[in-house]
């Protein structure tokens, strides 16, 4: 027999002996039966005592504790008289492969857990960011609710009802109005246009309700004026002087702001300018332009053009163009050309809007630039272009003027300076400025919701003086003001929002 098998049998004998002593089950196995298993050569001894081995076999079989360790125990004698036996042990091996699979599964689960945990941490950070944004938005909404400007949820059905009521009123006025019906006809056309605009807004942008409601209020006011004139049998009060003319005594009042919309690049783009192109040859066909600066508040890189105000309101049919050299919010558009301060220089440029290329550049003599004399609260606007009934102007300061405002009339084609006026108003004390009929009007900040038109300089007479015209605003800082002579409106860029105002002028006696 093999040494290993001899060892196993000896071990079994020992276990059986111990079981017999402890359990007192059957007689003990005689030691001579196993004295012949010291090694390989002991097989003959085992054969000579085969009967004793059989007896031992029976004794082992009667030991209950030993028999439980084996699944089978058989023996045989070959033709040489050698006893051979086989022992089958139970399947009690340790499941190493299962433990390895379990370890691998645990490792995979641990990796997945770490990955999900990192996602949770990232989501927690994002939630914190959005929570701050939501808080900021809540504060803005609270401010708007307290202000005279309010945003309401768009109720298109209610607007449609209001428009239909105005249509009925116009029909009644046409039937009963005794005098000229020209204004009534104009109102009817405007109401029809309003109906079309409401239908467009209903299917596209639902965030411009304020602009629509303001137009409805304006139309209702006109209808009331028509009714009053009919009842009192008095002539209709005509609007201010013909657009583009200067037959008046200057600006005396300004309306509440009309919020058009947020600029097309979003909340982060606080600085910029916008307005309506004015062309003396085609005053009623001016396109609308919006030019937000990059978030650094300095570089003018992208701007958009819209053919109509409806296109601007609905974000449709826009031409988006790119330049790489504009600086500050002092941009203006006149006769299909955009006028900008060249980046990091005191040069000015005319950009053709059809080709989006520089048509001409010119150095503005002695002009300070790069924040030397910019407006209060607004950086990079040392050079500010303006448009009025007389053409193109530029407002700036020089070292010689000790920072006071300088006004120059420009040739809109060559950018040559035609004439220059020096004021006594320190430019960094003003928040912004604009021109109307050759008169400079400067604004200053009163508080976070109010500006004041406080100063004027008339280039026609050389006179200057103080004013106190209150100008409400939506946000804290006014970045730019552009005037359009055709509709006599101010186009204001207010911390990313596009506002416009109607100007009231002093009527001269006929």
From Swiss-Prot:
It comes from the Eukaryota. Disulfide bonds join 246-437. SUPFAM superfamilies: Soluble quinoprotein glucose dehydrogenase. GO terms for biological process: cell adhesion; immune response; negative regulation of canonical NF-kappaB signal transduction; negative regulation of immune response; positive regulation of substrate adhesion-dependent cell spreading; signal transduction. One of its GO terms (molecular function) is cadherin binding. May promote proliferation of pancreatic cancer cells by favoring the transition from the S to G2/M phase. In myeloid leukemic cell lines, inhibits cell growth and induces cell differentiation and apoptosis. May play a role in the inhibition of EIF4EBP1 phosphorylation/deactivation. Facilitates cell adhesion, most probably through interaction with cell surface lectins and cadherin. This is Olfactomedin-4. It comes from Homo sapiens (Human).
């Amino acid at each position: 027999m093999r040494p290993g098998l001899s060892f196993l049998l000896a071990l079994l004998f020992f276990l059986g002996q111990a079981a017999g002593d402890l359990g007192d089950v059957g007689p003990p196995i005689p030691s001579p039966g196993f004295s012949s298993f010291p090694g390989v050569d002991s097989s003959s001894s085992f054969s000579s005592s085969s009967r004793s081995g059989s007896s031992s076999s029976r004794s082992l079989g009667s030991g209950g504790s030993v028999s439980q360790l084996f699944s089978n125990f058989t023996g045989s004698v070959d033709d040489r008289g050698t006893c051979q036996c086989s022992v089958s042990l139970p399947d009690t091996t340790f499941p190493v492969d299962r433990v390895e699979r379990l370890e691998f599964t645990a490792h995979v689960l641990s990796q997945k857990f770490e990955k999900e945990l990192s996602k949770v941490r990232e989501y927690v950070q994002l939630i914190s960011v959005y929570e701050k944004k939501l808080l900021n938005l809540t504060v803005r909404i609270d401010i708007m609710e307290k202000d005279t400007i309010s945003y309401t949820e768009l109720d298109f059905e209610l607007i449609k009802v209001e428009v239909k009521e105005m249509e009925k009123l116009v029909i009644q006025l046409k039937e009963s109005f005794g005098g000229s019906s020209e204004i009534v006809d104009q109102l009817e056309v405007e109401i029809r246009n309003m109906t079309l605009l409401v239908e467009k807004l209903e299917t596209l942008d639902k965030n411009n309700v304020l602009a629509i409601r303001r137009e409805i209020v304006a139309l209702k006011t006109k209808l009331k004026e028509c009714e009053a004139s009919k009842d009192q049998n008095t002539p209709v009060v005509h609007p201010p002087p013909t657009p583009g003319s200067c037959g008046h005594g200057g600006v005396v009042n300004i309306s509440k702001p009309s919020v058009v919309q947020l600029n097309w690049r979003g909340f982060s783009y606080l600085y910029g300018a916008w307005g309506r192109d004015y062309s003396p040859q085609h005053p009623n066909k001016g396109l609308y332009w919006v030019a937000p600066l990059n978030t650094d508040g300095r570089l003018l890189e992208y701007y958009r053009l819209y053919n109509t105000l409806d296109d601007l309101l609905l974000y449709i049919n826009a031409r988006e163009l790119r330049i790489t050299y504009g600086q500050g919010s002092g941009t203006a558009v006149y006769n299909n050309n955009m006028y900008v301060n060249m980046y990091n220089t005191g040069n000015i440029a005319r950009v053709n809007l059809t080709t989006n290329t520089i048509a001409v550049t010119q150095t503005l003599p002695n002009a300070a630039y790069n924040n030397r004399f910019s407006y209060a609260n607004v950086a990079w606007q040392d050079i500010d272009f303006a448009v009025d009934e007389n053409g193109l102007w530029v407002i700036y300061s020089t070292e010689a003027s000790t920072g006071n405002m300088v006004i120059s009339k420009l040739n809109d084609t060559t950018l040559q300076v035609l004439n220059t006026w020096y004021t006594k108003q320190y430019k960094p004390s003003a928040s912004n400025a604009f021109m109307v009929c050759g008169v400079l009007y400067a604004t200053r900040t009163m508080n976070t919701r109010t500006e004041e038109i406080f100063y004027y300089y008339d280039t026609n007479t050389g006179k200057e003086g103080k004013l106190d015209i209150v100008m409400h605003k939506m946000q804290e800082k006014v970045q730019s003001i552009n005037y359009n002579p055709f509709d006599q409106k101010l186009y204001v860029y207010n911390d990313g929002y596009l506002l416009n105002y109607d100007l009231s002028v002093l009527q001269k006696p006929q």
